[in-house]
């Protein structure tokens, strides 16, 4: 493996091998990360990286596209079958690119949008002032109820009536509960707004029937193709007949040039994998593991935003521990447990410190771990957060983590990916 790269650029080869070792020997609990199958990685590392293919299948600006046309058409058909939509655009390079394409297709600069507050679990591309969405549009925000930690739909409706937005965004990057897309469509219809569902985090759960689908409620749906969907890093737009033409044009030539055909091939493979029965079993186990891990963390005396989880992630409110999210992240890193610092609702700390950490189960579930392993992981996390400066203890836990991980290989070490 990597023999050509090692001969050409040994520095890069060494760094890749060290990263592979990190993934192999540690627990990946970042909610947005996962492991692709070997099949997806092979598609991405193929000769398709050499091919330009501006346009859509059958309507390219370059010759020699007969094979990449077939690949992209398969990706489109599989995406539509997986999510139950009539149209899909598989070309966005990322979830952010998918959102940019939707905004530029459906909005004019200065139009009003209503999105979820970033510190309440939203995403940068839903109106953050440091992002294009916050610079180009008139943004207002909704959030979660201070007592329950769950979306306050009554407040959302009140704000929508007051500002009459052109677009309401649903979906989040750090929200552990079910999103009521039907209720959000009712609110959107009441004020004459369009509804966009960004399901980047929950796409795999939606595809497997483990989270209510926005199809039939949202006017347009965006997602990434990694995270719970377990594909390559990329974006996807799903839509009906009403907006297909303008959304396709907004991707190309509106916001992108040539598509990444090697990534689209990886998407097609991942969509095919997600259509198999074992993917439904995998998605169900993600949620079972998340519930077990959440219960284990609370048994350690830790506080979870909203008191638990309905999906693949949970937010730990660290204020009772005296640690910031950044401090907790560093301590857990030393114990070979990877999480990310994350804001909690109305967080008093700045974004680079935060008062919370976000934890998710997609990656450890891909490795085949189940509820007993979640109980052990919760115990390790509790111990690290109680003794974050005890280097000997952290080193011991890192060794125990490595021992556990040897029994649950990552896909690169497998002949076949576990379900």
From Swiss-Prot:
Listed EC numbers: 2.1.2.1
N6-(pyridoxal phosphate)lysine carried by residues: 227
Keyword terms of this UniProt record: Amino-acid biosynthesis, Cytoplasm, One-carbon metabolism, Pyridoxal phosphate, Transferase
PROSITE patterns associated with the record: SHMT (PS00096)
Keyword Cytoplasm attributed: yes
Pfam families noted in UniProt: SHMT (PF00464)
Stored InterPro entries: PyrdxlP-dep_Trfase, PyrdxlP-dep_Trfase_major, PyrdxlP-dep_Trfase_small, Ser_HO-MeTrfase, Ser_HO-MeTrfase-like, Ser_HO-MeTrfase_PLP_BS, SHMT-like_dom
Gene Ontology cellular-component terms listed: cytosol
BP terms from Gene Ontology: glycine biosynthetic process from serine; tetrahydrofolate interconversion
GO molecular function annotations of the record: glycine hydroxymethyltransferase activity; pyridoxal phosphate binding
Subcellular location: Cytoplasm
Chief site of localization: cytoplasm
Entry function: Catalyzes the reversible interconversion of serine and glycine with tetrahydrofolate (THF) serving as the one-carbon carrier. This reaction serves as the major source of one-carbon groups required for the biosynthesis of purines, thymidylate, methionine, and other important biomolecules. Also exhibits THF-independent aldolase activity toward beta-hydroxyamino acids, producing glycine and aldehydes, via a retro-aldol mechanism.
UniProt subunit comment: Homodimer.
Protein's UniProt name: Serine hydroxymethyltransferase
Source organism per UniProt: Chloroflexus aurantiacus (strain ATCC 29364 / DSM 637 / Y-400-fl)
Lineage, top ranks: Bacteria, Bacillati, Chloroflexota, Chloroflexia, Chloroflexales
């Amino acid at each position: 493996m990597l023999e050509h790269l090692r001969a050409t650029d040994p520095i890069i080869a060494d760094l890749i091998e060290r990263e592979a070792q990190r993934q192999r020997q540690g627990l990946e609990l970042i909610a947005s990360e996962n492991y692709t199958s070997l099949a997806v990685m092979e598609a991405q590392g193929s000769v398709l990286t050499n091919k330009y293919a501006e346009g859509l299948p059958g309507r390219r600006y370059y010759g020699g596209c007969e094979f990449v046309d077939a690949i992209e058409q398969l990706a489109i058909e599989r995406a539509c079958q997986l999510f139950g939509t009539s149209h899909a655009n598989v070309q966005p390079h990322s979830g952010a690119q998918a959102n940019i394409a939707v905004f530029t297709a459906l909005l004019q600069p200065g139009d009003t949008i209503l999105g979820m507050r970033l510190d309440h679990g939203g995403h940068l591309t839903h109106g953050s002032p440091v992002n294009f969405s916050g610079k180009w549009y008139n943004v207002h925000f909704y959030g979660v109820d201070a007592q329950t930690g769950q979306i306050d739909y009554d407040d959302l409706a009140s704000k929508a009536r007051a500002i009459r937005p052109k677009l309401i965004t649903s979906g989040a990057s750090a929200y552990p509960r079910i999103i009521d897309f039907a209720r959000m469509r009712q609110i959107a219809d009441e004020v004459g707004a369009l509804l966009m569902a960004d399901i980047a985090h929950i796409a795999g759960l939606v595809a497997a029937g483990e989270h209510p689908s926005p199809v039939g409620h949202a006017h347009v749906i965006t997602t990434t193709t990694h995270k719970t969907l377990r594909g390559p890093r990329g974006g996807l737009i799903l839509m009906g007949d009403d907006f297909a033409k303008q959304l396709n044009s907004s991707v190309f030539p509106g916001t992108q040039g040539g598509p990444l055909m090697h990534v689209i091939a990886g998407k097609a493979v991942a969509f095919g994998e997600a259509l198999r029965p074992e993917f439904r079993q995998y998605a169900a186990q993600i949620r079972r593991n998340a519930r077990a891990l959440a219960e284990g963390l609370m048994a350690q005396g830790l506080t979870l935003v909203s008191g638990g989880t309905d999906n693949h992630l949970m937010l730990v409110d660290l204020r009772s521990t005296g640690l910031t999210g950044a401090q907790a992240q560093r301590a857990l890193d030393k114990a070979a447990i990877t999480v990310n610092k994350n804001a909690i609702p109305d967080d008093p700390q700045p974004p680079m410190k935060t008062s919370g950490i976000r934890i998710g189960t997609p990656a450890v579930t891909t490795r085949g771990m189940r509820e007993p392993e979640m109980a052990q992981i919760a115990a390790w996390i509790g111990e690290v957060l109680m003794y974050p400066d005890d280097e000997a203890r952290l080193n011991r836990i890192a060794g125990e983590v490595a021992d556990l991980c040897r029994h649950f290989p990552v896909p690169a070490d497998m002949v076949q990916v576990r379900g």
